[in-house]
Amino acid sequence: MSISNYRLQTRVRLQPLVLFQIIAAYERRPKTAKMAVGTLLGRRDRCNDIIEITNSYTVQHKEQQIGDMEQFKLDTQYASEMFELNQVTYPQEKIIGWYCTGKTLSRSAAALHGYYSRECGDMQPLHLLVDTSLRGGRLTTRLYCAVTMGVPGGTRGLLFTLLPLLKVNAEGDEAVALRLMQKQALHPTKQLGRMLPELVHVMEATRELEQKLDLVMRYINDVLTRKRRPDNSIGRALHDALTSVPLLDADSFRAMFNANVRNMLMSITLSSMIKTQMELSEKLSYLPDH
């Protein structure tokens, strides 16, 4: 089976969700584990020019030091079961590589490459290395691909080379969440460690929307009073935005808004209950068996 190497022009898009999953896996790793290991899922185009890493899951492993030798064993059955479960919900996601936490490539990289080469089919697996030590206050990420090298007819080896382009892709809901987290980091609340209530976020978003509407109204009034020259592209954008909003009377809009608020409050309550249950389960799992 021939395996093609990635071109240096390959662009990789990394969803922020994957970084949070890796950080959570590192924080929840067993006390005996030095690093967290997991499978990367995503999509690639037919030309292999753009690869998007959209999801990941942790794979259990065991590390054992015997003299100068380091033994690494991956739970491949667990990895296969996790992939099958993920395919039920996200059938479009395929295995594109694996991730590890640490400052440098581990000695187990070659063994992991061999396993994920079989899982990825006829494409080279990607290796994402995440430094969770936050040196310099930054989360350092490096993306590698293994290039086959050696003398023809002789011993073959692997050389892990960096892919030069690693683009963090944030759109839609993820972009909103990242802006909120950045705002919290730059302007923390008085009660440290707590996020603002969700309804306060709604009020802030509504206030920002009002400011943007005022800006649009000023532009329209300036055009009507001939203080500013009209721009056809802006006019078409405003027309598309206005026609995309359904025409509702005040009572219908109020009822729809109240229903959405109730749904949001219910989601907040359920998420708090799930969080509490997970914290209890995690603490109970560390209790000694009698």
UniProtKB/Swiss-Prot annotation:
Q: Which residues form the MPN domain?
A: 12-150
Domain of life of the native organism: Eukaryota
Record CDD domains: MPN_eIF3f
Q: Name one GO cellular component term.
A: eukaryotic 43S preinitiation complex
**Keyword hit for Metal-binding:** no
A Pfam family annotated for this UniProt entry? MitMem_reg
Per the record, the similarity remark reads: Belongs to the eIF-3 subunit F family.
Name of the protein this chain belongs to: Eukaryotic translation initiation factor 3 subunit F-2
